[in-house]
């Protein structure tokens, strides 16, 4: 039976450390500031933005939310990004995804100054990530690596299989796992013989947003299973992994909720602090 990878506990420990780092920055006369641009009324986006704001306030990080109407023009969004890029008090900047259809998400993200790109989504920072020369990492991917480190799960030489190829989780996590000398495969909706491939994984990560799609017969005995999915089924939150049966086969497994989710917001705040330190020559 698998042991639990407790992301909630690690997130709490990290929060204590981050609070001290913010205090240290303020002793140097530096105040971290995160600006979030949210366009429209997507309910999930509003929940995520509020969660970030609560955490930022708790740590002493100033967060400013630019809540724009759903019919906002792309030109006006780009002008706002330009003004925030030019503001020396703004240490980090992000656009909450998804954006309304009249706005090209790629163009908007590309406009962000890479030095303030807290989500690590600009082409320049994605390139640095794959080169192993990055100064910022996507929060969820960084949180997963930290969770594995915390439980002393070595990636060297391991077969790591990631189900999901998003720019937010799957692809950046693959880059970070390669840095740790894992052999990495990325699977997706068009991958053939999915179960045959997942059964080869020493470390299996699922990040597709499909409730309980990973069944016990798709998992190798003794595998480490990381569930990034958050899905609501019959009023309850479940992951992409069929938790109870898979737990019987895994050596380690993340629960949902309480696994990867709590780490994402904490690591976003860590990236804010890292960018702030870098911009002021304190890294």
Swiss-Prot record:
One of its GO terms (biological process) is methionine biosynthetic process. Keywords: Amino-acid biosynthesis, Histidine biosynthesis, Hydrolase, Methionine biosynthesis, Multifunctional enzyme, NADP, One-carbon metabolism, Oxidoreductase, Purine biosynthesis. Its EC number is 1.5.1.5, 3.5.4.9. NADP(+) binds at residues 164-166, 189, 230. InterPro entries: Aminoacid_DH-like_N_sf (IPR046346), NAD(P)-bd_dom_sf (IPR036291), THF_DH/CycHdrlase (IPR000672), THF_DH/CycHdrlase_cat_dom (IPR020630), THF_DH/CycHdrlase_CS (IPR020867), THF_DH/CycHdrlase_NAD-bd_dom (IPR020631). GO terms for cellular component: cytosol. It catalyses: (6R)-5,10-methylene-5,6,7,8-tetrahydrofolate + NADP(+) = (6R)-5,10-methenyltetrahydrofolate + NADPH; (6R)-5,10-methenyltetrahydrofolate + H2O = (6R)-10-formyltetrahydrofolate + H(+). Pathway: One-carbon metabolism; tetrahydrofolate interconversion. It holds the Pfam family THF_DHG_CYH. GO terms for molecular function: methenyltetrahydrofolate cyclohydrolase activity; methylenetetrahydrofolate dehydrogenase (NADP+) activity. SUPFAM superfamilies: Aminoacid dehydrogenase-like, N-terminal domain, NAD(P)-binding Rossmann-fold domains. It comes from the Bacteria. The keyword Amino-acid biosynthesis applies. Catalyzes the oxidation of 5,10-methylenetetrahydrofolate to 5,10-methenyltetrahydrofolate and then the hydrolysis of 5,10-methenyltetrahydrofolate to 10-formyltetrahydrofolate. Homodimer. Belongs to the tetrahydrofolate dehydrogenase/cyclohydrolase family. HAMAP family: THF_DHG_CYH. This is Bifunctional protein FolD.
